[in-house]
């Protein structure tokens, strides 16, 4: 180990020691270490078997579920649970790692799509997992094919790594990479081929550019797609979900390759994350019993259907950041069998995406079919989200708006409903959690 690496380790770990006692610093120690040695990540990661999880939606939950399973196998798994998924956050994760008690060093990391190529200059994953790619933060990522090419460029740097893809996404059909490829997906009963919803993106045939149809469409552009023009269809699946046993707003049960599993988290979109976690675990040699044990011990993920109480109100915090994710979150809360208040917190910082026009493509119209006595529109762009909610036809007099998140919290505390959902963009979620943590309603970190 050379001098600059040694200094980087010392500076990074010292800053982590100080910041952790102040309750801060998920990325700063890595930033400090990288200033001493820009290649320090290569030294830190060289003795690890690494699984990388990337994609638009579902990175954090897929990673958390996978870690829960692999802890049943290895006892200790390195990960970045708070979602610090750019190079400074990844460097911090390795800087603060504890020595493995089993002698097997394994890391499961969620990595930002735009940061992946740079990070792969320094790490050698054995497995890449891509959950999906949807339109997200257009000012940062551009359109979906730009994002996909960013990821493929990173994967090509590690040609020996296996790539695990969501086979239900037409975008992932026959990727131009030298790596071994495996697919996971929903293999449910098929019906007559039909067009996807008119507002769905990414439904052009990857071979002839015709419009795809679906024999089964789970949501957005995902499902058993087929092109009636050239015969192109979804590839054979290596990991198959064959039955939905139960689906509610806070849990689900399903069958994957003959084994029934369950997670204590709601929504169809999150079952894809569980399916990806099962596929990763099986790829790494875990059996179904260990997978079940891991799922049974899984708990709330940072800001992703995280539950807590404000006074006597049971509250659930849900991250939203793009049209598909927001629509699926709305589909999930629609399954609630009780009335609830709704808060929608919209920020427009860099990490949220500065362009907030995506809210007009999310299906907020569904709220008019739900038992929602009142809505709080909050965050920096509270007036924009309030306008979007009024356009749905929901009564304008039942919508309050404020940029003050303390006021949102106070409103929830004083409401008549015993249940509340808070849908929040990324930085709004962080700010709201910070407020909750300051009142000891939630833990600041979820390690």
Curated annotation (Swiss-Prot):
Pathway annotation from the record: Cell wall biogenesis; peptidoglycan biosynthesis
Q: Which UniProt keywords apply?
A: ATP-binding, Cell shape, Cell wall biogenesis/degradation, Ligase, Metal-binding, Nucleotide-binding, Peptidoglycan synthesis, Zinc
EC numbers for this chain: 6.3.5.13
Q: What does changing residue 140 to A do?
A: Strong decrease in activity
Mutagenesis or variant effect for residue 85 to A: Loss of activity
Q: What happens when the gene is disrupted?
A: Severe depletion of GatD/MurT produces a high proportion of aberrant cells, elongated or bulging.
Q: Where does Zn(2+) bind?
A: 205, 208, 227, 230
A Gene Ontology molecular-function term? carbon-nitrogen ligase activity on lipid II
| Keyword Nucleotide-binding among UniProt keywords | yes
Looking up InterPro entries in the UniProt record yields:
isoglutsynth_MurT, Lipid_II_synth_MurT, Mur-like_cat_sf, Mur_ligase_cen, MurT_C
Q: Name one GO biological process term.
A: peptidoglycan biosynthetic process
Q: Which domain of life is it from?
A: Bacteria
Reactions that this protein is recorded to catalyse:
beta-D-GlcNAc-(1->4)-Mur2Ac(oyl-L-Ala-gamma-D-Glu-L-Lys-D-Ala-D-Ala)-di-trans,octa-cis-undecaprenyl diphosphate + L-glutamine + ATP + H2O = beta-D-GlcNAc-(1->4)-Mur2Ac(oyl-L-Ala-D-isoglutaminyl-L-Lys-D-Ala-D-Ala)-di-trans,octa-cis-undecaprenyl diphosphate + L-glutamate + ADP + phosphate + H(+); beta-D-GlcNAc-(1->4)-Mur2Ac(oyl-L-Ala-gamma-D-Glu-L-Lys-D-Ala-D-Ala)-di-trans,octa-cis-undecaprenyl diphosphate + ATP = beta-D-GlcNAc-(1->4)-Mur2Ac(oyl-L-Ala-gamma-D-O-P-Glu-L-Lys-D-Ala-D-Ala)-di-trans,octa-cis-undecaprenyl diphosphate + ADP; beta-D-GlcNAc-(1->4)-Mur2Ac(oyl-L-Ala-gamma-D-O-P-Glu-L-Lys-D-Ala-D-Ala)-di-trans,octa-cis-undecaprenyl diphosphate + NH4(+) = beta-D-GlcNAc-(1->4)-Mur2Ac(oyl-L-Ala-D-isoglutaminyl-L-Lys-D-Ala-D-Ala)-di-trans,octa-cis-undecaprenyl diphosphate + phosphate + H(+)
- Positions of the catalytic residues: 355
| Broad class of enzyme this protein falls into | ligase
Could you give the subunit structure recorded for this chain? Forms a heterodimer with GatD.
- Membership in a protein family: Belongs to the MurCDEF family. MurT subfamily.
General function of this protein: The lipid II isoglutaminyl synthase complex catalyzes the formation of alpha-D-isoglutamine in the cell wall lipid II stem peptide. The MurT subunit catalyzes the ATP-dependent amidation of D-glutamate residue of lipid II, converting it to an isoglutamine residue.
Designated name of the protein:
Lipid II isoglutaminyl synthase (glutamine-hydrolyzing) subunit MurT
Organism, by scientific name, is Streptococcus pneumoniae (strain ATCC BAA-255 / R6)
Its gene name is: murT
């Amino acid at each position: 180990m050379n001098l600059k690496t040694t200094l980087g380790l010392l500076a990074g770990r010292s800053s982590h020691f100080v910041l952790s006692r102040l309750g801060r610093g998920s990325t700063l120690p890595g930033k400090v270490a990288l200033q001493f040695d820009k290649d320090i990540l290569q030294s830190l990661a060289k003795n690890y078997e690494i699984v990388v999880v990337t994609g638009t939606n579902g990175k954090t939950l897929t990673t958390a579920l996978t870690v829960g399973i692999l802890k049943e196998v290895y006892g200790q798994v390195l990960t970045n649970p708070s979602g610090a998924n750019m190079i400074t956050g990844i460097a911090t994760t390795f800087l603060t790692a504890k020595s493995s008690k089993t002698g097997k060093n394994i890391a499961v990391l969620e990595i930002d799509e735009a940061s992946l190529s740079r990070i792969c200059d320094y790490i050698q994953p054995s497995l890449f997992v891509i959950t999906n790619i949807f339109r997200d933060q257009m000012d940062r990522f551009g359109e979906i094919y730009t994002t996909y090419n960013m990821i493929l460029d990173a994967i090509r740097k590690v040609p020996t790594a296996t790539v695990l893809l969501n086979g239900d996404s037409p975008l992932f059909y026959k990727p131009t990479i030298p790596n071994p490829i495996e697919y996971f997906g929903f293999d449910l009963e098929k019906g007559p081929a039909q067009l996807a919803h008119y507002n769905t993106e990414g439904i052009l045939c990857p071979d002839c550019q015709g419009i795809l149809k679906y024999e089964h469409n789970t949501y957005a552009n995902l499902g058993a797609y087929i092109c009636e023009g050239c015969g192109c269809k979804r590839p054979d699946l290596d990991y198959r979900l064959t039955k939905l046993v139960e689906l509610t707003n806070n849990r689900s049960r399903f069958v994957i390759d003959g084994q029934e599993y369950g997670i204590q988290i709601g929504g169809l979109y999150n079952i894809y994350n569980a399916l990806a976690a099962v596929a990763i675990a099986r790829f790494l040699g875990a059996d179904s019993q260990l997978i079940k044990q891991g799922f049974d011990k899984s708990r709330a993920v940072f800001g992703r259907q995280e539950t807590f109480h404000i006074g006597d109100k049971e509250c659930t915090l849900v991250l939203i950041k793009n049209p598909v994710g927001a629509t699926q979150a709305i589909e999930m809360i629609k399954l609630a069998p009780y009335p609830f208040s709704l808060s929608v917190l919209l920020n427009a910082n860099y990490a949220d995406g500065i362009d907030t026009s995506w809210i007009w493509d999310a299906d907020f119209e569904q709220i008019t079919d739900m038992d929602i006595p009142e809505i709080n529109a909050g965050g920096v762009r509270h007036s924009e989200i309030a306008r979007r909610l009024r356009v749905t036809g929901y009564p304008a007099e039942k919508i309050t708006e404020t940029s003050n998140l303390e006021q949102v919290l106070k409103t929830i505390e004083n409401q008549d409903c015993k249940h509340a959902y808070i849908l929040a963009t990324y930085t709004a979620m962080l700010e709201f959690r910070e407020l909750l943590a300051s009142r000891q309603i939630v833990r600041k970190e979820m390690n």
